[in-house]
């Protein structure tokens, strides 16, 4: 019986599933729109919305440390959450992301979906928050 089972297993062990969700959420926060399979997108949506809610309501040292511990210590993503996304969604009480069905994948006919942040910055799609990029810019200036 499947009583009180809310999460999908996605054919992975717990550690792999949590790591995959963390990586997908980092990509979604960076690019504000990603294409993935439909079950992964449906599982990712509440996961990311909790991060945005923490960034909105707990814009303190404790909130920053919570986000850092849950996002692989990626400081650039946490800074974007606290500075950009928290201020963007300050008036909203939820529903920060949307999942739209896409086509099927050619290789295995898996149903694909686009998950994106509502009121997203269209120019953020190609940009990557990367530490190496900042180091290269500093090196070329000097």
UniProtKB/Swiss-Prot annotation:
- State the family it belongs to: Belongs to the bacterial ribosomal protein bL17 family.
Question: Which protein is depicted?
Answer: Large ribosomal subunit protein bL17
Keyword Protein transport in record:
no
Keywords assigned: Ribonucleoprotein, Ribosomal protein
- Subunit record text: Part of the 50S ribosomal subunit. Contacts protein L32.
Annotated GO biological process: translation
Q: Which GO terms describe its cellular component?
A: cytosolic large ribosomal subunit
Q: Which domain of life is it from?
A: Bacteria
The species is Wolbachia sp. subsp. Brugia malayi (strain TRS)
Q: Which GO terms describe its molecular function?
A: structural constituent of ribosome
Q: Which gene underlies this protein?
A: rplQ
Q: Does the keyword rRNA processing apply?
A: no
Query: InterPro entries, per this entry?
Result: Ribosomal_bL17, Ribosomal_bL17_sf
